[in-house]
From Swiss-Prot:
Pfam families: DUF150_C (PF17384), RimP_N (PF02576). This is Ribosome maturation factor RimP. One of its GO terms (cellular component) is cytosol. GO terms for biological process: ribosomal small subunit assembly; translation. The gene is rimP. InterPro entries: Ribosome_maturation_RimP, RimP_C, RimP_N, RimP_N_sf.
């Protein structure tokens, strides 16, 4: 269902100059919550941007009626520290510092240099490039340094 929602709202969000990072539908305290995460290629995602996107996609979602039950729409920034789960997440996070945990229990910190539909390339501290297929990744999380 979230894939259908993503397909419906992605073009609208891009027409406003922003990028759709993720869509998730969860249940919190017996209430359905539709979370839409954005990236602003020109800087931060402000409260005004979230409100603008919410006001535009809310009626669109109501008309499409993808979600049968009542729900709360939350529009937010993708966040400074987040788990990368899909090739799209990796592509939208190029150049960021990440913590990588592999299925073979190896872990390292690196800069995400490239990503495609099958793998991601990480620049290690010694500037060597390590290419890893997504199937070999256990968890990848962006790191924000203060």
């Amino acid at each position: 269902m979230t894939k259908k929602i993503e397909e419906k709202i992605e073009g609208v969000i891009e027409s406003l100059g922003y990028l759709l990072y993720d869509v998730s539908l969860i249940k919190e305290n017996e209430q359905h919550v539709l979370r839409v995460s954005l990236k602003n290629p020109n800087g931060a995602v402000s409260l005004d941007i979230c409100q603008q996107v919410s006001e535009i996609i809310s009626p669109l979602l109501d008309v499409c009626d993808f979600i049968q039950d009542a729900y709360i729409l939350e529009v937010s920034s993708m966040g400074l520290e987040r788990t990368l789960k899909t090739p799209k997440h990796f592509k939208l996070s190029l150049g960021e510092k990440v913590e990588v945990k592999l299925t073979n229990k190896e872990s390292f910190q690196a800069v995400l240099k490239d990503a495609n539909d099958l793998s991601a390339d990480f620049e290690l501290e010694d500037h060597a490039i390590k290419s890893v297929e997504y199937k070999d990744l256990k968890k990848v999380k962006t790191l924000f340094e203060w």
